[in-house]
Amino acid sequence: MRSDIVKKGFERAPHRSLLRACGLTDEDFKKPFIGIANSYIDIIPGHVHLREFAQIVKEAVREAGGVPFEFNVIGVDDGIAMGHSGMHYSLPSRELIADSIETVVEAHKLDALVCIPNCDKIVPGMIMAAARLNIPVIFVSGGPMAAGHLPDGRPIDLATAFEAVGAVSRGLMTENELRVIEENACPSCGSCSGMFTANSMNCLSEVLGIALPGNGSILATDPRRQELARKAGEQIVKLVEADLKFRDIVNEETIENAFTLDIAMGGSSNTVLHLLAIANEAGIDFPVEKIDQISRRTPTLCKLAPASQYHMEDLDRAGGISAILKELSKKGLLHLDRPTVSLKTLGEVIEDAEIKDPDVIRPIHNPYSETGGLAVLFGNIAPYGGVVKAAAVDPKIMVHRGKAVCFDSEEEAIAGITGGKVKAGDVVVIRYEGPRGGPGMREMLSPTSAIMGMGLGDKVSLITDGRFSGATRGACIGHISPEAAAGGPIGIIKDGDEILIDIPNRKIELLISEEEFKKRMENFKPKKKEIKSRWLRRYSRFVTSANKGAVLSDSCE
């Protein structure tokens, strides 16, 4: 066992003495040391209940013959950090989480790891750490919250609240009506109830093979969620005995499976960023062009909030992730022989799955569309690509030609949109919000929600080198690479320039002559902003482009 290096031999007497002070006995030194990476934190509703989850996992580990050691990692609530300077810290927190888990596990030579995440950057941060460490690992998330409901019974969620702010600013809703939404949108603990980033990543954990079935869809308040935690604690000891490590489970085919599910279920566009980062940590080269190839052959089988009235509880009732995977397997779209933490292949895991509600999960012969819910666009604005959640775009604006209205920060954009600077037919351009330029690649949920709340969702497009919340809907193209701060062409767009966005044909073009384009690029000097935070300055220096997953490079570029 890895842990023998800290518990075997007379040289380790001081180490054992310290471990005895933690309550260990001679018998414990014969057992595997299991780390429990818990992301419990009081200020994130998706994490407030994780303290008891960790206790369930620890008890199960002990009963199965392991020694559990719980430690905590930080977390950021993207909803609370949204729309102000706090969002600069969201994506960088992913790297801190990965680094901190690596630090604890390697410093103490733990044999295996149970990860208890739930919300946006915590899930990918933990998966990145697992890929880096390459030890036996299992994930059990805290689960989604239930959808909220208005007094008339209509389902709502956090995205409803953000969009309502835009409606109030335009006089389409009263503040009293907004208050009713505020008080009902988030009714319980758990990750926000739609197919937003957190739930997307927890669902993808199933197809990656690192979580047990149900991890993505069973509600946080469902007793089955606690049973899932207990099973995870038992299973991690079996994984140690089987010596099944992360990279034995996750390879290039597994990443392909993940993108296939992601595209079929209409996952958050942030998943592209995170899956690329996970692939990078696992030593897998996965170009963004390959994502679009997968999207073109993968049908859209689900449309959950923000693309419809359905939420995670509906997905769970309809058969969960296993039912979606079973449908995809009928078309030969998955690598079914990949191993999983259940010690079964993916094909064996989903063998008995079936759709229980074809309105929530469409059968493979009757998809929403024959192509996927995520698309990667290329063109002179985005030579390295841009990502759009096509499943959440109104059909009326899948192809849009409009005049640019440019902003150099999210704050400028919010002021301009709510101040009436943006009109029907425009293309909003928000730049200097990329990984390096932001820094931190902030989510543009407030600007997009303002557009939707003002009734312009089928009349205005938005492009940015930043990213979007999983709650975003509309013609919103993010992750434009290279970013403006790195000299990307998005930085040369001027107010009034015509832009063509053609999602079906995967194009995004600045409609100026080649000569004018070349001239602007030659004269372009990216803006530099003062970054007061020492951490964010370091992050800005070392972070890579969105098409590489916005991971930190080994050297300053």
UniProtKB/Swiss-Prot annotation:
GO terms for MF: 2 iron, 2 sulfur cluster binding; dihydroxy-acid dehydratase activity; magnesium ion binding
Broad enzyme group: lyase
Pfam families named among the record's database cross-references: ILV_EDD_C (PF24877), ILVD_EDD_N (PF00920)
PROSITE patterns reported for this sequence: ILVD_EDD_1, ILVD_EDD_2
Cofactor stoichiometry and binding remark: Binds 1 [2Fe-2S] cluster per subunit. This cluster acts as a Lewis acid cofactor.
EC number, as in UniProt: 4.2.1.9
Sequence positions bearing N6-carboxylysine: K121
UniProt pathway annotation: Amino-acid biosynthesis; L-isoleucine biosynthesis; L-isoleucine from 2-oxobutanoate: step 3/4; Amino-acid biosynthesis; L-valine biosynthesis; L-valine from pyruvate: step 3/4
Record carries keyword Transmembrane helix: no
GO cellular component: cytosol
UniProt: [2Fe-2S] cluster binding residues: C119, C192
Subunit structure of this chain's protein: Homodimer.
Protein name: Dihydroxy-acid dehydratase
Organism: Persephonella marina (strain DSM 14350 / EX-H1)
